[in-house]
């Protein structure tokens, strides 16, 4: 192994074990590169332990990467480390990006509750949108695990039935496979992300790839990933008016041309590969002339391209 690059997978690893790993790498002169995807763990209401793990990893890293300038500022504030900012690449297979979408007479506005993990609270969002849903169809999906989630104490099954009676297209199913996710995204036009906290989301990128307009909360840094409508939602509650305005904008908005999106994603993917190669080479102490602050990313503190 020449470089260890950590993205995920350390959620259950005690900080003292991470310190041992960092010391082992340092002893063998193997650089550690860390990409900070989540400053808050979306699966737990309290991210104290997650932050402690990040503190160990970020402190030991030869290079730190994150996905948005706002997250980079947080990393610098918390741990005094500057980050290379590289955007999240495409999520859907590149050959499927930009596929033609059939216009619907009645657009579908969707909410996905997933397994009702800690940062997801779809109920206030649904309650706010139900009175407005006459001009479009409202769909709610949930993974089967949601029925056994801690939030199920709030009578999830009864809630779902009430929404069905109110006209919501409610679907409970196994967690999506890759193919099922692509099919789902082809069936919806707008996807509201019901996150009360968090940092970044692959769903934002999947929506962009599929030509779906995401509506994202103003918590975390979801709004920096793509130019999607934003509403106010966080640990302190929901601004229902801002949600309804954002959904109205999303339903009426134009989508970028599919061919243009695929071309941009191909170019971005190659650029990110080049940047990561440069980061690895710099971590290893070898020369590299690729530069870091052009195109899609920059070192924190330098101006991002318009």
Model-derived regions: residue spans:
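Extended catalytic core of nucleotide-activated donor transferases of GT-like folds
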Residues: 1-60
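Conserved catalytic-core segment of nucleotide-activated headgroup transferases in glycan assembly
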Residues: 102-162
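Donor nucleotide-sugar binding/catalytic pocket of nucleotide-sugar-dependent glycosyltransferases
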Residues: 59-97
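A charged, aromatic-enriched C-terminal amphipathic alpha-helix characteristic of glycosyltransferases
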Residues: 237-289, 296-298
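Short hydrophobic beta-strand element within catalytic cores of glycosyltransferases
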Residues: 213-218, 223
């Amino acid at each position: 192994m020449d470089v260890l690059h950590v993205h995920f997978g350390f959620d259950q690893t005690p900080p003292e074990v991470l310190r041992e790993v960092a010391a082992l790498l340092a002893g063998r002169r193997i650089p550690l590169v860390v990409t900070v995807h989540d400053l808050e763990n979306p699966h737990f209401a309290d991210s104290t332990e997650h932050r402690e793990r990040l503190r160990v990893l970020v402190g030991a890293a030869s290079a730190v990467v994150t996905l948005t300038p706002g997250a980079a500022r947080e990393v610098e504030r918390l741990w005094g480390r500057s980050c290379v900012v590289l955007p999240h690449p495409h999520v859907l297979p590149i050959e499927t990006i930009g596929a033609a979408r059939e216009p619907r007479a009645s657009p579908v506005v969707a909410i996905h509750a997933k397994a009702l993990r800690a940062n997801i609270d779809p109920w206030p969002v649904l309650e706010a949108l139900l009175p407005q849903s006459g001009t479009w169809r409202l769909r709610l999906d949930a993974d089967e695990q949601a029925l056994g989630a801690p939030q199920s104490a709030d009578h999830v099954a009864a809630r779902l039935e009430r929404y069905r009676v109110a006209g919501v297209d409610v679907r409970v199913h196994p967690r999506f496979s890759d193919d099922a996710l692509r099919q789902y995204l082809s069936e919806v036009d707008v996807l509201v992300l019901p996150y009360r906290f968090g940092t970044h989301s692959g769903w934002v990128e999947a929506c962009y790839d599929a030509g779906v307009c995401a509506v994202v909360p103003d918590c975390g840094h979801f709004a920096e990933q793509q130019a999607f409508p934003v509403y106010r939602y966080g640990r302190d509650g929901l601004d229902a008016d801002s949600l309804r305005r954002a959904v109205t904008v999303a339903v009426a908005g134009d989508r970028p041309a599919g061919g243009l999106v695929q071309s941009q994603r191909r170019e971005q993917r190659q650029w990110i590969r080049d940047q990561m190669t440069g980061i690895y080479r710099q971590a290893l102490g070898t020369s590299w002339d690729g530069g870091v602050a052009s195109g899609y990313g920059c070192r924190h503190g330098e101006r991002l391209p318009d």
